[in-house]
Amino acid sequence: VKNDMRSLKLHCIGVVQNITRSGMSKSQKLQACWSYVINNTYYSSAYYPNLNQNDWWRMTAWRTLATGKGNCYGYACAFAALAREIGYDPYVVCGRVPGTRDGAGDGFTRHSWVIINGLHYDPEGQAKGWHTGVYGSYSYGMDNQIQKTVNFRTGRGN
């Protein structure tokens, strides 16, 4: 997949035009973006982004939207890219949640989700069914450790 940020922008414009109507509210458009990512992305653990690479969040969004495959980072970045396209200012969260996938002794595993205006969104948790209902939630709803957040537009974060 060619990691071209112009291609990401054009792809997001096309998706948003296909899944929204002019009479929809901004929140209705966000729900349409959420549904699109959940219903058009298949889980694949074949690719993990290098979180130290410049623009990893944009490259991950492009890879996921272009191939229809991704892990939690892919779901989060794809949703953030579409949310950005409709005028939101999303943050991609890189954190840890209870789990055993990483084999860490503390019982936590890597995970990624999105925060918009202080509210949490977990498209991969919803799609896979292990952490449903985290859509515009005031809290994440389970123990978590936030390691860093990245503003999708600027790349700034902690």
For the regions a protein language model found, what residue spans apply to each?
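Secondary-structure boundary elements
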Residues: 2-64
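Active-site nucleophilic cysteine motif
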Residues: 29-37, 68-83
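Short, low-complexity, Pro/Ser/Thr/Gly-rich segments in the mature regions of secreted, periplasmic
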Residues: 144-158
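Hydrophobic/aromatic-rich core segments of domains that either
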Residues: 74-143
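Extended aliphatic helical segments
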Residues: 1, 15-16, 37, 92-93, ...
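Repeated polar recognition positions within modular binding domains
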Residues: 44-47, 55-56, 66-67, 109-110, ...
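Arginine residue identity/basic-tract feature
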Residues: 2, 6-9, 21, 58, ...
